[in-house]
Amino acid sequence: MGFWKFPPFLVLSILVLYQAGMFHTAPVRLPLESSFDSATLTEEEVSLLLVAMVKDYVQMKATVLEQESEDFSITAQEKSCNTASCVTHKMTGWLSRSGSVAKNNFMPTNVDSKILG
């Protein structure tokens, strides 16, 4: 998923740098090209393309955030359990954790049956 986040930034930065005037270099002509001129974008077309890309990026981010919020609400619903089996499972976990603490802290070490009576 991380791969899809990089290309929009790359294209957006190239268009911004083009708008700023950083990429005004001479075009490379191959010997096979005859009189065919490559299509160039006018200032208005570049601006429209930039706006469309930003709009698409914002829509993509909104979709991703919406999916993450749906995943979070599903996780929250799974964590809140009201059924008897779920509550029993939670209580078993609490008792097993507190049992190990009680064993370590409160159990006498040298106790015989003769001492207790």
Curated annotation (Swiss-Prot):
The keyword Cytoplasm does not apply. The keyword Secreted applies. One of its GO terms (cellular component) is extracellular space. GO terms for molecular function: calcitonin receptor binding; hormone activity. Residues 1-25 form the signal peptide. Disulfide bonds join C81-C86. InterPro entries: Calcitonin-like, Calcitonin/adrenomedullin, Calcitonin_gene-rel_peptide. Keywords: Disulfide bond, Receptor, Secreted, Signal. One of its GO terms (biological process) is regulation of cytosolic calcium ion concentration. It holds the Pfam family Calc_CGRP_IAPP. Mainly expressed in the thyroid gland and CNS. Found in the nerve cells of the cerebrum, hippocampus, hypothalamus, pons/midbrain and thalamus. Also detected in the glia-like cells of pons/midbrain and in meninx of tactus opticus. It comes from the Eukaryota. It is found in: Secreted. Residues 26-79 form a propeptide. Belongs to the calcitonin family. This is Calcitonin receptor-stimulating peptide 2. It comes from Sus scrofa.
